[in-house]
C-alpha cells in the first residue's frame, strides 16, 4: 500500500475554487472521482488522521499514488464533469448503483423496424422502452392480455426472418395474438402504431384507450354489428383487467419518482417507486458501498446523477416531480440540470404530509427490507469468494492476496483460425469489461505452446509499453486549468497486471507462459495451468501437480474461470471461422465487397443456406442486383462441396 503522505499536495497548491478531482493508482488508473465547492477543503480531508476515515476511504487513499484536479466555472459544471468522468473511467471506489436483478422489465424495442415486446434484464439499450420491473409471472399475464388489443410481435429475429422467407406466420398469427407484419398482413407503419399504443397504455394512458373502445362498442351496437361489439367488449374487459391491477396511490395527474434510503456505516440501500398517472408503474432498487461518510442528501445527489443522466434510457424517464427524503445541498443546480435533460420543468421536493408522505414511508420500508436481503445474500457470496481465494493463495504458496486473476485459452480446428481469449476475475468476480480476444497467425499458430507464448508476450509487452508511456507522461509539467470538458485520453487496455495467470493446459502451456514472462523481465506474476482430465494444477518447473480436493472452493473457482475462458475463445473462433468460410467462397466475385458478403450471410443465416439459394433468392438481398446474383451463384457452383465432419469422432455428417 502507498503512503498518502508520499503524494499529498501542499495545502497552498490546492485552489479554493469549485472543481472535480481524480485519485489514480500506481498504474495510472482512475480509482475515484469526486467534486467539491472548495477543492482545498475537500482534498485535505482525505489526508487527515487515518483513524477518522471510513474503511473504504482508508483503502482508497492508500491504494492511490497521485491526485489531480480540474477547476470549473460553477457547481453545475462540476456536477456535469463528475458524471462524465464516472461514466468514462468507471472508478472502482465510486458509488456503484447496482440494480436489484430480482425482477425483469417489460421492454418494447422501438428502435427496430418492426418493434417487438419482450422480457429483458440487465443493461438498458438505446431505442428500447422499459416498463417495470415486474415479476416474471405478472409480465407474462400482462402481455398475454394486452396482445388481444395491441397485437405487437413478440417473436425472436430468427423466427421473424423464417416467417418472412416462408410466407407463413407462426402460431401467434393464427390465434390473433400478432398482427403478422412478417408476411405483410399489416405494414411497418401500422405495426409501429400498434407498438406506440402499447407503450402509451403501459405509460399511463389506459383510461383514454378504454374510453375509445367503449365508444366504438356503442357505435357497433347502434349499427347492429353485435359480433364486432362483442369483440370490443372483450377488449375492454381485458384492458380493465390490466388497468385495475395497479391501485391508485396518488392523484391521477401525478407523475413522480419517489426515492428512499436506508443505510448503515458501510452501505446504503436505495429504492424508487415510479408513479405515472397516479399509479405505481415500476420499482427499482440499488445497493451501494460508501467510500465517504455520506448523509442521505449526498447519496440522493449521486443517485439522481446516475439514474437520469444515462443517455441510453428512454426519453420520458424523467417525471415532473422527484420526491426525496432530504434535499441535496445543490438542489438548484440539480433541478436546472434535470430540467434541461427533460426539456420541461422538474421539481425536487420532500413530501411533508398526505398521500405522498405515506407512500414515501412505504418506499423506505422497501429500502430497509432490500438492505436486509442484500446483507444475507452477500454474507454467503463473500464468504465463498474469500474462502476460494484464500485456499488458492495457501495451496500455491503465494505471498500476496489474489486481487486479479487472468485466464487464457487457445481455440482452433486443426490449426486453422487460431484464436485466444483472456478473461479477468477481480476479487473473485468476473470483470467482463476487461476480457480480451486475440487472433493468432503465422508461425505462432503452429501449435498451442507457440500460440500461448505469443499471446502472453503481446499482452504483457503492451502492459510494459503503457507503463513506460505513463511514466513519461508523469515526468512532464502538469498544469491545472479551468476545464469544461472531460479528458479525452484513450482508455488503457492492459495497464493493470494480474497476481496470477491461469492457462488451460498442463506443463507445456505453463512452460511457454513462464518463458514469455521471463523473456520480458516480469518476475512478480505467478503462473499455473489447469489440466482438464484430472483437474490437476501445474506450476512451472514442478515435476508433480498440486491436487486440490474435489470439494475445494479454490478448485471450483479455477474451473469456472477456465470454463469461461474456453467459452469466450470458442465464441470468437466460431465468429472468425464463419467469416473466413464466407470470404473463401465469395472472394474474387467482382463487385462483391465485405459489406455485401456480410449482407448475404445475414440474410440467409448460414453458408449452407446461401449455397442452396438460386439467383432470384440471392437478388432479393439489398444491394445485390440480378447480374451480381448470377456471379455469386456461379462462384458458389464452382466450389466443390466438402463434407462436414465431426472432428471429435471423424463421422461424416452430410455428403
Swiss-Prot record:
Report keywords, A-Z: Cytoplasm, DNA damage, DNA excision, DNA repair, Excision nuclease, SOS response
Q: Which InterPro entries match?
A: GIY-YIG_endonuc, GIY-YIG_endonuc_sf, GIY-YIG_UvrC_Cho, Hlx-hairpin-Hlx_DNA-bd_motif, RuvA_2-like, UVR_dom, UVR_dom_sf, UvrABC_protein_C
The GIY-YIG domain is annotated at 16-95
Q: Indicate the segments annotated as coiled coil, or none if absent.
A: none
Q: What is the role of the protein in this entry?
A: The UvrABC repair system catalyzes the recognition and processing of DNA lesions. UvrC both incises the 5' and 3' sides of the lesion. The N-terminal half is responsible for the 3' incision and the C-terminal half is responsible for the 5' incision.
Q: Which family does it belong to?
A: Belongs to the UvrC family.
Stated name of the protein:
UvrABC system protein C
Amino acid at each position: 500500500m502507498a503512503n498518502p503522505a508520499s503524494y499529498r499536495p501542499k495545502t497552498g497548491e490546492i485552489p479554493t475554487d469549485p472543481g472535480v478531482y481524480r485519485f489514480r493508482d500506481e498504474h495510472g488508473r482512475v480509482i475515484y472521482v469526486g467534486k467539491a465547492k472548495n477543492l482545498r477543503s475537500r482534498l485535505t480531508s482525505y489526508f487527515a488522521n487515518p483513524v477518522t476515515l471510513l474503511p473504504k476511504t482508508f483503502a482508497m487513499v492508500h491504494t492511490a499514488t497521485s491526485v489531480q484536479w480540474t477547476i470549473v466555472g460553477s457547481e453545475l459544471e462540476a456536477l456535469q464533469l463528475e458524471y462524465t468522468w464516472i461514466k468514462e473511467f468507471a472508478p472502482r471506489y465510486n458509488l456503484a448503483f447496482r440494480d436489484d436483478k430480482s425482477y425483469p422489465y417489460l421492454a418494447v424495442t422501438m428502435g427496430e423496424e418492426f418493434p417487438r415486446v419482450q422480457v429483458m434484464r440487465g443493461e438498458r439499450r438505446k431505442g428500447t422502452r422499459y416498463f417495470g420491473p415486474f415479476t416474471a409471472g405478472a409480465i407474462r399475464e400482462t402481455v398475454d392480455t394486452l396482445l388481444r388489443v395491441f397485437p405487437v410481435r413478440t417473436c425472436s429475429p430468427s423466427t421473424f426472418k423464417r416467417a418472412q422467407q416462408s410466407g407463413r406466420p407462426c402460431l401467434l398469427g393464427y390465434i390473433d395474438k400478432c398482427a403478422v407484419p412478417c408476411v405483410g398482413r399489416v405494414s411497418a407503419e401500422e405495426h409501429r402504431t400498434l407498438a406506440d399504443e402499447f407503450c402509451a397504455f403501459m405509460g399511463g394512458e389506459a383510461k383514454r384507450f378504454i374510453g375509445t373502445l367503449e365508444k366504438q362498442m356503442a357505435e357497433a351496437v347502434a349499427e347492429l354489428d353485435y359480433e364486432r361489439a362483442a369483440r370490443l367488449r372483450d377488449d375492454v374487459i381485458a384492458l380493465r383487467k390490466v388497468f385495475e391491477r395497479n391501485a391508485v396511490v396518488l392523484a391521477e395527474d401525478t407523475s413522480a419518482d419517489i426515492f428512499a434510503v436506508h443505510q448503515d456505516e458501510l452501505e446504503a440501500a436505495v429504492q424508487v417507486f415510479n408513479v405515472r398517472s397516479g399509479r405505481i408503474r415500476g420499482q427499482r432498487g440499488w445497493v451501494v458501498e460508501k467510500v465517504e461518510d455520506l448523509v442521505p442528501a449526498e447519496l440522493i445527489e449521486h443517485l439522481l446523477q446516475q439514474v437520469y443522466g444515462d443517455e441510453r434510457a428512454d426519453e420520458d424517464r424523467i417525471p415532473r416531480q422527484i420526491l426525496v427524503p432530504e434535499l441535496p445541498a445543490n438542489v438548484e443546480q440539480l433541478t436546472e440540470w434535470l430540467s434541461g435533460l427533460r426539456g420541461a420543468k422538474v421539481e425536487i421536493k420532500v413530501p411533508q404530509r398526505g398521500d405522498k408522505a405515506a407512500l414515501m414511508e412505504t418506499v423506505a420500508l422497501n429500502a430497509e427490507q432490500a438492505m436486509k436481503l442484500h446483507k444475507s445474500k452477500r454474507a454467503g457470496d463473500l464468504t465463498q469468494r474469500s474462502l476460494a481465494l484464500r485456499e488458492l493463495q495457501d495451496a500455491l504458496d503465494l505471498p500476496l492476496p489474489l486481487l486479479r486473476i487472468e485466464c487464457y485459452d487457445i481455440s482452433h480446428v486443426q490449426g486453422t483460425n487460431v484464436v485466444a481469449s483472456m478473461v479477468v476475475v477481480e476479487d473473485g468476480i468476473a470483470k467482463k469489461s476487461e476480457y480480451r480476444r486475440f487472433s493468432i497467425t503465422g508461425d505462432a499458430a503452429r501449435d498451442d505452446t507457440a500460440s500461448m507464448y505469443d499471446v502472453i508476450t503481446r499482452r504483457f509487452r503492451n502492459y510494459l509499453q503503457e507503463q513506460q508511456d505513463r511514466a513519461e507522461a508523469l515526468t512532464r509539467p502538469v498544469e491545472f486549468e479551468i476545464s469544461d470538458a472531460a479528458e479525452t485520453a484513450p482508455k488503457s487496455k492492459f495497464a493493470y497486471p494480474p497476481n496470477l495467470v491461469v492457462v488451460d493446459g498442463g506443463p507445456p502451456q505453463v512452460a511457454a507462459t513462464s518463458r514469455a514472462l521471463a523473456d520480458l523481465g516480469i518476475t512478480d506474476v505467478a503462473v499455473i495451468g489447469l489440466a482438464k482430465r484430472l483437474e490437476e494444477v501445474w506450476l512451472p518447473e514442478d515435476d508433480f501437480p498440486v491436487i486440490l480436493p474435489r470439494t475445494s472452493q479454490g478448485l471450483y473457482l479455477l474451473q469456472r474461470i477456465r470454463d469461461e475462458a474456453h467459452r469466450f475463445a470458442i465464441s470468437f473462433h466460431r465468429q472468425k471461422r464463419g467469416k473466413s468460410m464466407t470470404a473463401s467462397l465469395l472472394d474474387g466475385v467482382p463487385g462483391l465487397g465485405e459489406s455485401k458478403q456480410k449482407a448475404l450471410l445475414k440474410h440467409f443465416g448460414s453458408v449452407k443456406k446461401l449455397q442452396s439459394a438460386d439467383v432470384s433468392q440471392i437478388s432479393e438481398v439489398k444491394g445485390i442486383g440480378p447480374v451480381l446474383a448470377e456471379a455469386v451463384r456461379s462462384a458458389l457452383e464452382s466450389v466443390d462441396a466438402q463434407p462436414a465432419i465431426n472432428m471429435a469422432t471423424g463421422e461424416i455428417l452430410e455428403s
